């Protein structure tokens, strides 16, 4: 797995496919290859997929003594996409990754072509205590031995088999204390947005997901029936069809947002060059790809053909 230096970290990542860039952010204690295993084969046909390991996860080493803060994950993402040369991109986040995605969207909405978040609430409520209990290593040892073994394998690389024992309490300490996003914050998120949740999610009540989708300027909601927190893996057909349909429906807007940002960047570069002549730089390269910058075009034709998407599970609800 390659790495790139960003925000003081060697961020490990997976990359698949070719096309407009799509960044996928995994949940706490997980990895992109696990959370999005059912999405990678399908969406790599039309997009260049980037799946970075969050700090302390997988192969992205992290100084446990420094602590863990959710806003640092936003800084990490910003540094990662800058280092990758991704001016604009599609962004999908799950759980912890969804919070990172939302906070990045507040900070830099103009960078996003579209936004999709799964299993996320922007409200403080009692269910955060559920997450905190799950992040207790002593409880995990006693009640979840299979999960403990998996965590050891998942986060062992370069950090030691017990790395997760430092990671869980660090994440738990920041759950419920990170700043809440306000209605004003959410109104800044102007790219087309999809909010997805399961109707049996132990962490996110449906009314919270519904409220989030209503507060986003261009939001829509997917509710997965009979599903808990991990909509992408528990209802992959439903989620894949909904996400592919979302990309089809917003393709023109997404392309326009990418072009608008490119024009602004070119104008800023021209103004800088005219005010202070400098040597012409070498052609920009994408350090993640090792060759050319990620494509900035529109979605590939397969998105117009629903037969390419996995068949949806019966009974999905969108609003």
Feature annotation, model-predicted:
Residues 200-204:
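Acidic catalytic loop of the alpha/beta-hydrolase fold
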Residues 191, 205-214:
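Short alpha-helix in the alpha/beta-hydrolase fold that links the catalytic acid
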Residues 170-185:
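Active-site nucleophile elbow and catalytic-triad environment of alpha/beta-hydrolase enzymes
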Residues 189, 195-197:
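Short beta-strand/loop motif that positions the catalytic acidic residue
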Residues 219-220, 225-266:
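Catalytic active-site module of serine/aspartate enzymes centered on a nucleophile-bearing elbow/loop
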Residues 99-107, 112-147:
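Flexible "cap/lid" loop of the alpha/beta hydrolase fold
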Residues 9-62:
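Conserved HGGG/HGGXW glycine-rich cap/lid loop of the alpha/beta-hydrolase fold
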Residues 71-89:
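Conserved acidic catalytic loop of the alpha/beta-hydrolase fold
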């Amino acid at each position: 797995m390659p790495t790139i230096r960003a925000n003081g970290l060697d961020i490990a990542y997976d990359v698949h496919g070719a096309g407009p860039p799509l960044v996928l952010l995994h949940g706490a204690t997980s990895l992109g290859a696990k959370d999005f295993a059912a999405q990678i084969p399908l969406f790599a046909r039309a997009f260049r997929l980037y799946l970075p390991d969050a700090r302390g996860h997988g192969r992205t080493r992290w100084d446990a003594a420094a602590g863990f803060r959710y806003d640092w994950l936003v800084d990490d993402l910003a540094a990662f996409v800058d280092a990758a040369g991704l001016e604009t991109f599609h962004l999908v986040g799950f759980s912890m990754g969804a919070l990172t995605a939302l906070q990045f969207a507040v900070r830099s909405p103009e960078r996003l072509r579209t936004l999709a978040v799964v299993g996320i609430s922007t409200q403080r409520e009692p269910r955060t205590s559920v997450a905190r209990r799950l992040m207790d290593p002593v409880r995990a040892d006693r009640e979840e031995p299979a999960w403990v073994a998996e965590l050891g394998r998942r986060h062992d690389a370069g950090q030691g088999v017990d790395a997760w024992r430092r990671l869980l309490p660090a994440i738990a300490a920041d759950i419920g204390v990170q700043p809440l996003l306000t209605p004003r914050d959410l109104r800044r998120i102007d790219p087309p947005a999809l909010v997805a949740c399961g109707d049996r999610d132990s962490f996110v009540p449906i009314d919270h997901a519904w409220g989030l989708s209503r507060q986003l300027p261009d939001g829509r909601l997917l509710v997965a029936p009979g599903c808990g927190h991990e909509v992408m893996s528990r209802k992959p057909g439903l989620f894949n069809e909904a996400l592919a349909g979302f990309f089809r429906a917003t393709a023109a807007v997404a392309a326009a947002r990418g072009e608008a940002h490119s024009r602004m960047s070119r104008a800023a570069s021209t103004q800088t060059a005219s005010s202070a002549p400098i040597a012409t730089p070498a052609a920009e390269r994408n350090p993640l790809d090792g060759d050319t910058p990620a494509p900035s075009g529109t979605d590939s034709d397969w998105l117009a053909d629903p037969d390419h998407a996995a068949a949806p599970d019966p009974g999905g609800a969108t609003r």
